[in-house]
């Protein structure tokens, strides 16, 4: 997440929730690019994602490497003047978290329908919740809604 001064968005005429996609200019063992949302929900925050093996590679190099990659990508589109607008930046290291192993759920092509099978409990003793099984997958609100739905199921099973 990058926080920019409001002048950045005005200077480049960026409207709220504009998508940003980087162009991959070279072939490598895996693509090196990012995508994001600028002026997220009309705030002065912009959010970016990298994925796959490249995300893991960046994490090994540390938070600064992820931030530098995104900033360099933005510089190639907006020029070096963006530096004067930057307030602060933060990158997560979810891939290093042993409980998550990453931060974005996705399904293999043609397999998204299998998310529904995760909504079923195992013998009404083990229940699953989270953004990966929500119809609003890859979102915090999807995780929240899924957790609430699962809590209701558990309450019914326990007859509370």
Q: Model-found features: residue ranges?
A:
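Central beta-strand plus flanking loop segment that forms part of the substrate or channel wall
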Residues: 1-13
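Conserved flavin/dinucleotide-binding core of flavoenzymes
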Residues: 11-160
